[in-house]
Amino acid sequence: MNNIIVERLSLLREVMRREKLSAFIFPSTDAHNGEYVPDHWKSREWVSGFNGSAGTVVVTQNEAALWTDSRYFIAAEEQLQGTGIVLMKLKMPGTPTIPEWLGRKLVCIDSPEVGVDGMVNSINTVEALRFELRRQGGITLRTNFDPLRDIWTDRPAIPQNPVEIHPVEYAGVDTAEKLVQIRKSLARQHADGMLVSSLDDIAWILNLRGSDVHCNPVFVSYLLIGPVTATLYINKVKLQNGVEEYLCKHGINIDDYQNVKSGVKKYEGFSLLLDPEETSYSVFKAVGNVDVVCQTSPVPYMKAVKNDAEIKGYRSAMLKDGIAMVKFLKWLKPAVEAGGQTEMSVDRKLTALRAEQPLFRDISFDTIAGYADHGAIVHYEATPETDRELEPHGLLLLDSGAQYQDGTTDITRTIALGPVSEEEKHVYTLVLKGHIQIELCKFLKGAAGTQIDVLAREAMWRDGMNYLHGTGHGVGSYLNVHEGPHQIRMEWKSTPFVEGMTVTDEPGLYLAGRFGVRIENTLVVEKYKETEFGEFLKFDSLTLCPIDTVPIDKSMLLQEEIDWLNDYHARVYRELAPHLNDEEKVWLKDATLPI
C-alpha cells in the first residue's frame, strides 16, 4: 500500500509542477463540509493512505505532512510508515500550524502559490488560510483547482442511492412546520433565504433519509430555502417510491445537483444566508450580486433540541440496543474462553445481534473493538492485518452503535475478559468516576459543556492523568452519530444546554502500548428544578446496558457514585429483563448486582 502512496505523490507532484503550484492542501471534508464523507471525496485518504475521520495532508514538491488530533496519533504513525509523509500532532508542543510549516518550507521559492480545492473547503477555512499564508512571506492561495481530477482514474462516482421518507411519527414535526420556523429565524437574522449545504440538516428539514454516506442516513444534495419556495438540488434518479410527489406536496422544487451555483445566482436582489463554516468557498464565489449574510445556520440548533416523538424514539432504540448488548455480553466471555474470537469476529457478532432487532437499519459508525494495547488507540479499527485474537484476561474496549429508524445509538463498554491488573482496575475506576460525575451533574440553565467537562476529569487530574478528546457530543435522531452545536469538551463551546438535547458522556484514559478504557452512555437533558436562583437542568441516561463491575476498585468510589451505579443497574435490569429469555435474565441479574 505504501508503495502505491509514493507513486500517487509522484503523480500529484507532476500535476503541481505543471500548474506551478508550490504546495497543495487536502482536508478531510467534502463539498458539504461533513465529518463523514462519501468515497468520491476521500482525496486526503487517496493521497496519504490515512483513513481517520479528521486530518489534513499538505504536499510540497519535496515533502509531505499530515496534521491530525490525538485520537489518531498511533493509527497515523502506523499508516504513514514508508510513505514519506510526516505526522504533525495537533495541539502538541512544538507542532507548527500548516501556514507556519509552509512558510518555512517555501521560503526559498519566488512567489509561492498554494492550492486548495474551493469546493471542499468552507468560506471560513479559505479566508483564514489566505490571511495566515499572506503573513508567511506573502504566499498566495489558489482555490479553483482539483489536482486529482485526471490522476485518480478509478475515483468512485458521487453516490446515487435512493432516498426514503422518514415518517412523521418518528420525526415528530412535519417539513412544512420546520420551514416555517426556519424562515422565522432567517427573518431575525435579516435574511430572505438560505442555502443549506449540510447533509444531515437537509435530511432533518425534509424528513427524508438516504444511504450515500457510510453509517450516516443522508443523501448528497443542496437545499435552497427562499422566502416562499424551496429547491432541492439532487440527482433525480434518487427520488423513487413517491419521494418526488412527497416533495412536490410540500412545495419543494427539484433541480439537478450540479445546478446549485446557477440556482443561487437567481437570488440577486435578495439577501441569502450562507453559513461560513458549512458553505463551500466555490459556491460562495458563484453567488454574483446576491446580498450574502455570512452567519451561523439556525438549523443545527433546531435539530439538536429533540421533540417528544424523537425522545420516545431514542428510548425505544436504546431498549433494542440494550437487548442486543446483553445478548452479546452474555456470549462474549465464554466465547473468548473457548478460543478463536478476534476483534473483528466480536464486531460481526454484535452487528448480527443488532440486526435481529426491529427497525435496525445499519451501524452508526465503524465499531472500535480494541483488545489490550489496541484499546489505547482512541479510534482504532481492526483490519485483517491488525486483527488480534482475544484472550481470557485483560481489557476489551468496545465502542459501537446502531441506526434504528426510531433513533441512533452510541455506547462504549470496557470489558474485563478475565483477570485484570491493579493498574487496569485503578485506571478503569478513574474513568468510571468521571463518567458518573457527569451523570450526576445538576447545572444552571445556560451552562455550556465547557463548564461541565471538568467533572469528568477531576479525579484523573488528581492522579496526573488526562485524555485529549472531548467528553461528549450530540447524537442525531436516525441521523449522524456526531451532532452539534453543543458539546462537552475542554475547549470553549458557547452553546448552552437546553431540555431535549442529547449528548454522550464518554471519558477515557489511554496508556499507549498497554491498554485503554472508555465508558460511554448517551444522555438527554431534562428539567431538574426551579428555585429563586433560576432554572436548573440535569441529565438522564438513555443507554440501557450494564457497566462491567469486575475491574472496579470500590475503595476509590464515593458513596454517591456507588449509589448511582447500583440505581442505574437496577433500572437496566428492570427495563431489559422483560424482553430476555430465562438464561439471559439470570446473566443480567448477576451483571447488575449491587456492589
Predicted regions and their residues:
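Active-site neighborhoods and metal-handling regions in enzymes and metal-associated proteins
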Residues: M1-I595
